[in-house]
Amino acid sequence: MRKTRVTALGDSLTKGVILNERNRYSVSNRCYMDIIGNELDMQIDNYGKFGCTISSCSNILERHAEDISSSDYTFLEYGGNDCDFDWKKIADHPLDMHTPKTGLKVFSEQFCKLIQQIRDLGSKPIIISLPPIISFQARPNR
């Protein structure tokens, strides 16, 4: 029996980037995509990319269109970097109006377009929601 094939597109969470014990970013050897693949016996091609936004995913889509078209499912995890702000600008001008890297309207339009492009390639898009941000200090005993 053939393994279910998945292509994963997204940002550093998809890639499995963590802050290691030396306070440096590195790719975890237990990324959640690897765990899903092992637990559900799926072949997952992970094209997550550090810092990726919905605007930059069109290049990734073009580069991996063949993999997507041969995948049963395509996991999409975007939004974490899109909703980020220019924090230096906010610190320098805290009373000004500030907008995220990608506005809601643009994000929605580009995400809907991405979903349709994946469908057009013959894969079923699966949208993955961002995990909640929980400070490590909020749970010191865990």
Q: Each predicted region: which residue ranges?
A:
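Alpha-helical cap/lid subdomain in secreted, periplasmic
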Residues: 62-142
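Active-site loop signature of alpha/beta-hydrolase-fold enzymes
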Residues: 12-15, 52-54, 81-83, 133-135
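Generic hydrophobic secondary-structure signal
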Residues: 6-9, 13, 32, 36, ...
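Serine-esterase "nucleophile elbow" of acetyl-processing enzymes
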Residues: 1-48, 64-70
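Structural motif
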Residues: 52-62
